[in-house]
Amino acid sequence: MNADMKWLDNPEVFRVNQLEAHSDHTYYESYEALEKKENALIQSLNGQWEFVFSKNVKSRPENFYEEDFDAKNFDKIMVPGHIELAGYDKIRYINTMYPWEGKEYRRGAYSMESTGDGAGMFSEAEYNPVGSYIKRFDLDPELCSKRVRICFEGVEEAMYLWLNGQFVGYAEDSFTPSEFDLTPFIREKGNVLAVQVHKMSTAAFLEDQDFFRFFGIFRNVTLRAVPEIHLEDVWFRPELYKDNASGKLSVNLKVSAPENRKINARFVLKDQEGSVVLEKSAALQEKNGIYTEEIQTDDAQVKAWDNHHPYLYHVYVELTDESGNLSEVVPYDIGFRRIDVIDKVIHLNGKRLVLTGVNRHEWSPKTGRCISMNEMKSDIECILRNNINAVRTCHYPDQIPWYYMCDAAGIYMMAENNLESHGTFQKLGAIEPSCNVPGSIPQWKEAVVDRARSNFETFKNHTAILFWSLGNESYAGDDIEAMNTYYKEKQDGRLIHYESSFYNRAYEDTISDVESRMYAKPYEIEEYLDHDPKKPYLLCEFMHDMGNSMGGLGTYMHLIDKYDMYHGGFIWDFIDQALYVKDEVTGKEVLRYGGDFDDRPSDYEFSGDGIVFANRVEKPAMQEVRYYYGLYR
């Protein structure tokens, strides 16, 4: 198969040769390696790459992926990172509009009769920047003679991949991992990896979030060697009984190995003191080299997980061959908690759930959405310090470590899909969905369901996730209903959230387990709850903290005492989106916001809505948050 630039125009092509999404577990070949946290099966490709920027597809270096290509005119660029922050293209901040508005007329493929299939919309555009990357590497010794895969944890927005002159695959969805099998093409030494990243494709219509519009390889890139017997996917399903003191655990395993092998799996659940709570073994059933099993445990005494007591158990899954030799061990931390809706009121472990939440973009004033572990840890500390008990991953999946941090800290999560098509149904504030995507357009359905699948499969084992969110501000139609159906069929006990069905009540019974609003006034909340409400109510966004804001928080919080079906909400938002630049006059480092980069169209200082500044200094409004949230956390 050869790479085809026309895929950029086609909403039905969003992954080519990608491996299936799977759980985000790590794996080791021995307990010794696990205890030392030294994983010789992983090789990072982060660091300096060769790079060239092109204005559009036709001016890109077409044959740059060939092994004998002369890249002497290429620059150097650091991965991970945004191409714009390396000095290429233009820095742009936009809220609802698409970056081409006022410059080019574009409507999503098949969204209007006049649009047709959108052929050439992005592949032949005069402006659609391309970043061509080359990484040369030798395999670490421990990866040799094994199956080798590559994982890109985040690439905006569409990417083509080659290794040693051979086409490997294509991916969209900027914020979930894209993984490919390199085994047929890789060698021990002298590998040439080539990645071509396109700023816009049909995925641009689905990624119209309120943020700076960057592109490039902005999250980690790793090679992963796969043992002969390998746990491809694991789904831990802890069940907490109504006494909040006992429960059981189901474990679904999917293992790859050569055919006709006798493979055994054993899992052990230990408490924080190291005592064994549950233990069970099973022989795996094989079909075409894939071995599966569902293991059910007996009942056991367990401790419940919640925001005040985020108790996690340590699980270890061992895979052994027919001789009893250990092939792989997988660690994971899980908690026991129970979500119920009783008389239209959400309960966690039998108690009414109150959300003192915040929406959180991933942001660094120096590196944009390419944030560090220290910045994530700082955010966790700030959240706990100020009585915030929940985060919404607006409006895309976050880096994988963030979910583990929230599990450990007891921070409730609304895990949102990478979806916002705001600009296709809202024009300068007016609701006008004539060209909405995905809507009910068949050609867009699989792309958005795939985003739901990637979100679920990657993060399904995280105790902190109480809600799956279908996306943000994308109107409502059959395609989003299909996403809702996908999550429902998983029956994982979590609730499904979506706000924009408010604009299309034809779907209110088939999309979302909650009535969700953004920026509803207090009297509007009361009006809904006073008139035979159908669902529990929450605010996915409220208290827009732009400028000197947050003064009305108490009015909203007092409604929690008045209405059991009102569950609080998520402040917009956690952190200002602003970038450090050197001031032209003083030479000092200052923060600049949307519109400060001569970016048009722009929504200007609308990028500054946080309860902390971009440098993570708390704003004066935080004292309101800390006080009122402290009354209900």
Language-model region placement:
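Active-site region of glycoside hydrolase catalytic domains
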Residues: 232-240, 247-250, 263, 328, ...
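Accessory carbohydrate-binding/adhesion or oligomerization-edge regions at the termini
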Residues: 1-110, 192, 196, 557, ...
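Accessory beta-strand-rich segments of carbohydrate-active enzymes
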Residues: 3-16, 21, 36, 50-54, ...
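Short glycine/proline/serine/threonine-rich loop/turn segments at secondary-structure transition edges
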Residues: 143-146, 186-190, 299-312
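Substrate-binding clefts and catalytic carboxylate motifs of secreted carbohydrate-active enzymes
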Residues: 37-61, 78, 84-86, 128, ...
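Active-site-adjacent substrate/metal-binding segments within catalytic domains
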Residues: 81-139, 143-151, 157-162, 169, ...
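Beta-strand-rich binding/interaction modules
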Residues: 161-163, 246-284, 293
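Surface beta-strand/loop "capping" patches
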Residues: 228-259, 624-633
